[in-house]
Amino acid sequence: MKNIPLIGYTDKLSLRPGETVSFKVSSTLKKSFSASLKRSISADPNPKGIGIIEKDASKYFKTSFFKSRKQSFNPGSYAISKTPIKVSIKNNLNLSVIIFPTLFSSKKQTILAFDNVEIYINSNRATSIRVGNDSISIKEPLILRSWYKINIKISLSGKISISQKNLKNKNKNGLINNGKISLNKVLSGKVSLAAVVSKGISHNHFNGKIEAPIINADGKKIGDWDLSANTNSAFVDSIIGPKLLLKNFPTRAVTSSKWDSSEMNWQHKPGHYAAIHFHDDDIYDFEWDTDFKFKIPNNMPSGIYIMKIKGDGNEDSMPFFVAPKINKTKSKICVLISTFTYSIYGNHARVDYKDNWLNRIKEWNAYPYNPANYKEYGLSTYNYHSDGAGICHASHRRPLFNLRPGYITFGGSKSPCSGLRHFQADSHLISWLHNKELDYEIVTGEQL
């Protein structure tokens, strides 16, 4: 995973006087980095224009220094129970789940994990079950984009059975493999889907859909989750057992094994949309710790501001947008800042991007990073996941390259035009208002 030496983001894009913005920074520098406040007037790096213009705003925030520290991020969506499950087993443990794999990998892909029991797809594309250090697998590989019902039975006597049935191929018998394994009498821990989680970090992400996970001990259900329920939430309510928390926003209300195209609205027939689609590159919130905060002063004018951080020849700019207090507007001109557009297009990796775009970036001293080269930072809803599915969710709670002064959207043009969109292009209006000495205030899409 490629890391940028100095980069950050804010917890909020839209603020008013009296509200506080938090800055979250990752720095691999050996020394501290500085932070200074600027008011952004022009974000266009084109040398044939007025260039990037940023006015000093240190009267509101004095330049300060902060200790460098690297902050990591963990792409990949998964589900994990809010609380642990503890069960004493007298005879046997049964697990079942329905899956629809969408991308194979040379690495293990976890489907369901509980304590030292794990259902996964191995590097040979076969369904496997691990208990402790022992495992067995189905002898035939899975077929991509096919629905499978997986059943596991493990007994304290040491017997284990794994069966797999292709739900769309009624003419083919299910596959079974048996073996011997040692099962602990007591199992305890959180249940996870689509990844195994250790010390809060997820690994071995599954690409595909998961439906109807059930855990049964001695004929009694201890975990049963209907993934078609409350699909507008980041939690999955349980039929039995603890709720599941969804991390990194997997796609909900997707077609499941019973879907037959008879209903296109998931709300009318939720049983046909009872799966969740997980991806190894889902990312929503980096969840970095806060390095410093800034409370917007009452006398700070409405406008576009950036917190510029610098160190060892590296720099980054974190924009935020300050609107006036409600019912305290002074200007006759209001500029709408499209923060929703900025977020949805956040880190849009263009299909026409080429490395020669870096030539113009270097010549213009423009923003040096492009999401096409840093896809692990999460892409936009105009891009695709690693398995080819469209990206459904995007947020500003991560560094957004295209929300930076000097970012060039279209770098391949031979013409002298700036090649801008969104934040940088919108700054043409802001710089014009300043040039004409026209008083204005802003409001963002989030604030409307």
Label each region the model flagged:
Residues 1, 7, 91, 185-189, ...:
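Low-complexity, Pro/Ser/Thr- and charge-rich linker/hinge segments at domain boundaries
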Residues 9-32, 36-43, 50-52, 57-75, ...:
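Ligand-binding face of N-terminal immunoglobulin V-set domains in extracellular IgSF glycoproteins
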Residues 11-13, 84, 102, 297, ...:
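Residue-level recognition of the GNAT/N-acetyltransferase active site
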Residues 16-20, 146, 199-209, 291-335, ...:
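Conserved, well-structured beta-alpha core segment at the onset of a catalytic domain
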Residues 17-22, 44-262:
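Extracellular glycan-associated modules
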Residues 25, 84, 91, 214-221, ...:
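Extended amphipathic secondary-structure runs
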Residues 30, 38-40, 254-284, 314-448:
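Aromatic-Pro/Gly-enriched surface loop or interdomain linker
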Residues 88-90, 143, 185-187, 300, ...:
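Extracellular/periplasmic catalytic domains that process cell-envelope and extracellular macromolecules
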